Amino acid sequence: MKRGIYAVLLVGVLIFSVVASGCIGGTQTQTETQTPEKTQTPTTTQPSPTTTTSPTQTTSQTPTETETHTQEAECGSGKVVIWHNMQPNELQVFQSLAEEYMAMCPDVEIVFEQKPDLENALKVAIPAGQGPDLFIWAHDWIGKFAEAGLLEPIDEYITDDLLQKFAPMAREAIEYKGHYYALPFAAETVAMIYNKKIVSEPPKTFDELKEVMEKYYDPNNEKYGIAWPINAYFISAIAQAFGGYYFDDKTEQPGLDKPETIEGFKFFFENIWPYMAPTADYNTQQSIFLEGRAPIMVNGPWSIGSVKDAGIDFGVAPLPPIIKDGKEYWPRPYGGVKLIYFAAGTHNKDAAWKFVKWFTTNPEVIKQLALDLGYIPVLSEVLNDPEIKNDPVIYGFGQAVQHAYLMPKSPKMGAVWGGVQGAIDEILKDPKHADIEAILKKYQEEILKNMQG
């Protein structure tokens, strides 16, 4: 997405900043899904602190010349106020769609209010009864906002038929501790970006990927088999491929000492790292691909602008499955989801629900967001639309989202990132001889201590 829903998490080595606006949450220079700290990757979970000034209100009753969407709208009445921190280009598209809805539902008024410091504005206004009906941000706020009583449950509106319209990761993103608080409209994760001049078709299995890495690994000429930033966010795909995890949102426990997680880490450092440049940072790895010194890069939608600027003829595809002992294991990278949340004490819940349901389940709306803004759809049927399938970026990342592991929603995840990164940094001191199992178990204990206070 435009600057990606990209979160920057730095706890110890990472911080929670936010991998979506271009980002998942709003649109500041930051996004909200949590990812490792890199200037090119996700930005921050916390909007940069600025004083909230008088809200900029935008209300329109006159439809613009946008395509007429055929899905019938359920109509409420009265005003629905939506707080956001979107960029101007995003806001323009959202307003256009809202105007279309208002043309079908003349008794409702949709008002967008810009909040530069959205999180703090919500934390002050909602308890005072002065909050919005809705607000837009990434799913990573759902845990801490629900715990603080800042969200309005919408359980009475949720049906199984509705949930099945969305990708599995998106369905999971809108629920916290048995209650639903939002509906999803876009997502983000990492995938393979491949140089078609070097590799005409993406590898379909990990064995095929390994053949490509072996073929093009030529360190004496500064050429490598793959470009892949090494940090907690980016290698989550392999670390979690065999059923392991950094953190279980349901039990709220870390999982670095799980056999499946250990297997994932070992697989990465035994089967991928040997074909990489020894410098693991984001900028170096991306530059290797942009300079044509690697056939494939693992990265997110936020990197596509740089890939295009480099003049590379590229494609996007999910990381391929690992076939082991006759079983297929799909890499499961972390992903984030953009949501429209219901604020606690919403003043016009029924009208807000009808608008949000229309907005998030109308295929033409989601298609327009994808084509105009580069948002990755989570409405499953849109991924089969011919225009979407013909867009290599949207379709490729959309397929990757189907295998993504949702970024944890619990506030306790904050204690996990630093421990995971610490383990990775220790392994990188000597990847060939590192006792990966012992290192992961060591940092499991460190995370548990940090979680306890």
UniProtKB/Swiss-Prot annotation:
Residue ranges of the region described as Disordered: 27-73
GO BP: maltodextrin transmembrane transport; maltose transport
Signal peptide residues on this chain, from the entry's feature table: 1-29
InterPro entries membership: Maltose/Cyclodextrin-bd (IPR006060), SBP (IPR006059), SBP_1_CS (IPR006061)
Record-linked Gene3D superfamilies: Periplasmic binding protein-like II
Keyword rRNA processing recorded: no
Record-linked Pfam families: SBP_bac_1
Keywords: Signal, Sugar transport, Transport
Signal as UniProt keyword: yes
Ranges of biased composition (kind: Low complexity): 27-65
GO terms for cellular component: ATP-binding cassette (ABC) transporter complex, substrate-binding subunit-containing
Top-rank taxon, per record: Archaea
A GO term, aspect molecular function: carbohydrate transmembrane transporter activity
Functional note: Involved in an abc transport system for maltotriose.
Annotated family: Belongs to the bacterial solute-binding protein 1 family.
Protein's recorded name: Maltotriose-binding protein
